[in-house]
Amino acid sequence: YDWLSKVTGRTLAWGMLTGVRPTKLAMQKLEAGMSRKEVCTFLEQEYGVSHQKAELGIAIAEREKELLGRLDYEQGFSLYVGIPFCPSICSYCSFSSSPLAEWEDRVDDYLKALCQEIRALGERAEERKLNTIYIGGGTPTTLEAEQLFVLLDTIQKSFSFEDLQEFTIEAGRPDSITREKLEVMRRFPVTRISVNPQTMQQKTLDLVGRKHTVQDVKDIFHAARELGFDNINMDLIAGLPGETAEDMRDTLCQIEELSPDSLTVHALAIKRAAKFGQEQRKIDLHSEIEQMVEESARAAERMGLVPYYLYRQKNIAGNFENVGYAK
């Protein structure tokens, strides 16, 4: 890294770190008794991490340590339930999901098998403590309201919620969320949902294949608030095709007006570069995404949100990171 940096005249914000969770390294050093200043110096000198990113990693490691300390590592466990369907596949996405239209006649079969597995797991985990539940995907709200009820009812009947600390449903795309589905969620102890616009620029939503409008995002968010959801996350992506730092600023202004309880900002992971014609985009986007990331951090601070988790991916645009902010 040092040699390449010298030859090219370039440095990377995360230096030579390539792992998914750079906060793990910071946490290991903190748990070993090093001071915050010592950990920062270590990351900068040993791995070439910039001072700004070292401070970010340490701050998040400290918060993660406090949050993870609430979990029971001996008897506790977390449950993840995956719904591998989406209304359509976004151009930038490489997650394991399929368009609902291709599998619509098999969703009931999938749900039946999934519920059977949940009941079996509930029997095996009877003596353990369920700490957190996360229903993700895909897009969980591609399930119809009746199907969503069956899933949530099966989970509730299969596990004790006595030790449950968080129950998240990644409601996801506004074009799959309805008031009826939100009402179903309210019948169960769901504590957190995620409404994910990715951008508030209509031109970009159309370009990447998301079949909803900016107004749809706002309408669903307000409907969730009216129904009593008091922990709503929103996801954004920095570096979507055709977007500028100015577009990101406008998106963030609209998000601030909604005032979500947490915000997750992803730097675009270019895994399907050929589809976008973006092989060069990883290099070209560095300065633009840097501005977007900085604007996001400032917007989060204005909303009273602090960074609490961080992870990185291979081929991430600009060699940046994904950061979650919460109150």
What is each model feature region?
Residues 27, 78-80, 168, 237:
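Short aromatic/hydrophobic contact patches that present stacked aromatics
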Residues 6-7, 45, 187, 226, ...:
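Residues at alpha-helix termini
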Residues 18-24, 45, 60-62, 96, ...:
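Short, conserved phosphate-binding/catalytic loop or strand-edge motifs used
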Residues 74-109:
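Canonical Radical SAM [4Fe-4S] cluster-binding loop centered on the CxxxCxxC motif
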Residues 4-11, 31-79:
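N-terminal [4Fe-4S]-dependent radical SAM core
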Residues 97-296:
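Conserved non-cysteine loop/helix-boundary elements of the Radical SAM core domain that shape
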Residues 1-37, 41, 279-327:
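Auxiliary Fe-S-binding modules of radical SAM enzymes
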